[in-house]
Amino acid sequence: VPFWSSEPTVRKVYKVSIPMEKEMQFQFYQGECTSSMRYEDGRKAYTFAMEDMMPFRREPNMVDLFDAAPKLMMSSTPHWKDKSLWFNKVNEDYGSFAPLPEAQKKVDELIKGKKTEMEKIAVLTHWVADNIRYAGISMGKGEGYTLHDTKMNYTDRCGVCKDIAGTLVSFLRMAGFEAYPAMTMAGSRVESIPADHFNHCVAVVKLADGTYMPLDPTWVPFCRELWSSAEQQQNYLPGVPEGSDLCLTPVSAPENHYVRIKADNRLDANGTLRGTFTIQAEGQSDSNIRSIFTRGFQSQWRATMERQLLAVSPKARLLSVDYGRRSEERRVGKEC
């Protein structure tokens, strides 16, 4: 529960009433509040309040407000393992990942000729990422932590993160892997109290060595990674049958995200600089460079390249662009 405000506030109160037989744990972070628990009409009433609140001061490029401003976290779930087991059971009972003949045919086609587990995982992750379009369509009451089934996702070919992740889990299972959905909070940390503080759904797959590898097909389009390294050290909770504690995504070393620029320039007698740049990148650096092209229409590519040059010099002129048939064949001529 966010306990910050964008306006001066005299008093903010949050009250929750639960059955007597229920237990609830809570903690207030990054500030102080008054709290109480009273018995009212045969129920437990928890009240939390702050007074004389001023707008929380923001800073440029600051962390998410959930990581800096006052907030209340509470849960009736004892431990993260309990929530992990529940998340697993609710989807297994519903049959979210039941195999589908036409989807099985596609899986067999994709993994044909792939020899290693990582080759199979990669081709399935990228196909799901590129072919299940992200589209948030309201379906009314009932939307929540239960993932839509394979038939719906494969037929519609669209959905939000849980539909994309659910499709990948289904594909991985049809390829013989042990895979499950996982919950995460993109943009801020998840505290130790097992509260419902998630905004994103991903997947995990068990590797041959017995470890689970996180996969995020929602962020994979136009990205060479299987998990966005822009989300390093991010908390996530897998819905696995043995139950899991809160996990943390691994750190990716800087050398996995290099940028190498080779410049071949010549200064003419009249002071004009002519030449070419060759840029090589990997990981998130590669994704950032690709985003110059992937975040707009192809008809805007030339204007986009011109903006890149004008950022170097307002007198720069784009002479020519040869995008080639493949990304590695794209060449740009420039003049400064």
Predicted regions and their residues:
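Secretory-pathway-linked proteins and extracytosolic
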Residues: 1-142, 268-271, 276-293
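Short, solvent-exposed loop/turn segments at the edges of secondary structure
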Residues: 9, 41, 102, 196-200, ...
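Solvent-exposed beta-strand/loop surfaces of large extracellular or lumenal domains
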Residues: 26-46, 182-185, 251, 291-324
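Short, conserved phosphate-binding/catalytic loop or strand-edge motifs used
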Residues: 104-105, 140-149, 185-187
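Hydrophobic/aromatic-rich core segments of domains that either
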Residues: 162-252
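Long, His/Glu/Asp-enriched segments that create or flank divalent metal/ion-associated functional microenvironments
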Residues: 246-249, 259-264
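Conserved small/polar residues in nucleotide/adenosyl-binding loops
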Residues: 329-336
